[in-house]
């Protein structure tokens, strides 16, 4: 059996949803899975995160350059957490044959603080399943790194069983600092996971990482399964990643429990004269659940509201919501920054989604700079409804109706000059 066929079979066994962006060397995997085409890699990963929140394992297949496009949700996943496993299957074009640059995707493991698995000919099936298990255990996206040498090689077919062990998103009772502290604790656990992982065979001599030859085998390439004593010499396909990271150790862990709103003593909430407060209160009262974005809408994840499930970075709410809550709340700037591609994809596929765009003509949550762009100018394809934030009756009607397909509502409001987020004692 060829490595490409083994990876396809293993993914079909371990995952429920597949998204793919063709490109050498993973086009055959995308086709073999009949993966859903997506407008870009960032949107594909956000769809997968939405699947995760809904209890579905999801795989996103892309070539090395595509990993650059989805860096934001990849990094954010560890802080926000997830439920069912999400794995980015990335093919590295090492020559390159069909790429404009040579890239080693393993470095994203360090940047995003996520596990990276690089199977060899004897560990294709087990390596795929382990990537999903690690994603669930450590509540973050996993990376499965593939190379042409593995995909073209004759490999061993094993019978690894699927064992779902869903994780949990970060507790909404945690502050942002508390979520980061939680992420750090889980990240430090990756080191013991790698060192104790049975997929590795560290017996001395020259170690081969992934499909590279060696007397020992390294599969969990980030974090590496040993230091210089265990891995004195390493053969690798690409840059000397494992050799460079043999000395990496877990970070110093704070003895304090992750910070909660209760331990901090207050919640942060919207400005006192926020024009959208009526909408937010209505969503809370009706127990609406939504994917929310970076910016003011992220405050909806607070226990004060209990509306937002998670936020995976700027522009993420639309694709995440399309595969989970079917409701997204996003700011006008976030939409134009990097959310509009997801909205295009949602309308192309007619995915049910109520997309609520907060038009306050502000660029940032902290700076409040005036925006130069009006989203209405660029949303002709969506035929959006424009509703004043003060028209709570109309907004109430829109929240009541089931969404048969995509509906975009621009809620128009003007932020108070000099307004600042308020705090509420716990």
List the model feature ranges, each with a label.
Residues 1-17, 118-296, 380, 384-426:
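Flexible, low-complexity linker and terminal segments
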Residues 17-20, 24-103, 107-110, 114-117, ...:
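Thiamine diphosphate
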Residues 30-33, 99-108, 158-159, 369-380, ...:
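Short, aromatic/basic amphipathic alpha-helical patches
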Residues 73, 157, 163-165, 349-350, ...:
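A generic membrane alpha-helix/interface feature
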Residues 159-161, 307, 345-346, 373, ...:
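Hydrophobic alpha-helical segments
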Residues 323-327, 340-342, 346-355, 364-407:
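Extended, non-catalytic scaffold segments that flank or surround catalytic motifs
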């Amino acid at each position: 059996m060829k490595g490409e066929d083994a990876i396809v079979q293993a993914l079909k066994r371990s995952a429920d949803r597949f998204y793919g962006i063709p490109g050498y060397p993973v086009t055959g995997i995308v086709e073999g899975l009949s993966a859903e085409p997506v407008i870009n890699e960032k949107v594909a990963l956000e769809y997968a995160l939405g699947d995760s929140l809904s209890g579905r394992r999801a795989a996103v297949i892309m070539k090395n350059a595509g990993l650059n496009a989805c860096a934001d949700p990849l990094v954010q996943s560890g802080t926000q957490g997830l439920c069912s496993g999400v794995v980015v299957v990335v093919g590295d074009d090492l020559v390159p044959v069909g790429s404009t640059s040579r890239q080693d995707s393993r470095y994203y493991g360090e940047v995003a603080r996520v596990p990276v698995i690089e199977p060899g000919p004897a560990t294709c099936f087990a390596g795929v399943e382990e990537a999903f298990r690690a994603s669930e255990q450590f509540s973050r996206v996993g990376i499965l790194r593939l190379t042409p040498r593995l995909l073209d090689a004759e490999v061993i077919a094993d019978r690894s069983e699927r064992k779902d062990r869903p994780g949990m998103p970060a507790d909404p009772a945690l502050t942002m600092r508390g979520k980061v502290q939680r992420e750090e604790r889980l990240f430090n656990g990756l080191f013991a996971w790698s060192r104790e992982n049975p997929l590795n065979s560290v017996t001395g001599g020259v170690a081969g990482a992934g499909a590279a030859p060696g007397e020992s085998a390294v599969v969990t390439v980030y974090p590496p399964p040993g230091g210089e004593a265990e891995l004195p010499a390493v053969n690798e396909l690409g840059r000397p990643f494992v050799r460079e990271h043999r000395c990496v150790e877990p970070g110093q862990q704070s003895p304090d429990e992750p910070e909660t709103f209760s331990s901090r003593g207050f919640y942060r909430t919207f400005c006192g004269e926020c024009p959208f407060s009526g909408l937010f209160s209505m969503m809370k009262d009706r127990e609406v659940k939504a994917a929310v974005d970076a910016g003011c809408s992220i405050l909806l994840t607070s226990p004060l509201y209990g509306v937002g499930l998670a936020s995976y970075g700027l522009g993420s709410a639309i694709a995440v919501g399309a595969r989970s809550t079917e409701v997204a709340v996003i700011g006008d700037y976030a939409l134009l920054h990097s959310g509009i591609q997801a909205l295009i994809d949602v309308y192309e596929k007619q995915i049910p989604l109520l997309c609520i765009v907060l038009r306050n003509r502000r660029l940032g949550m902290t700076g409040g700079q005036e925006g130069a762009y009006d989203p209405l100018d660029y949303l002709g394809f969506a035929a959006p409804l424009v509703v004043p934030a003060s028209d709570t009756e109309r907004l109430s009607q829109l929240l009541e109706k089931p969404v048969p397909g995509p509906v975009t509502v621009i809620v128009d409001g003007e932020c108070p000059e000099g307004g600042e987020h308020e705090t509420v004692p716990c």
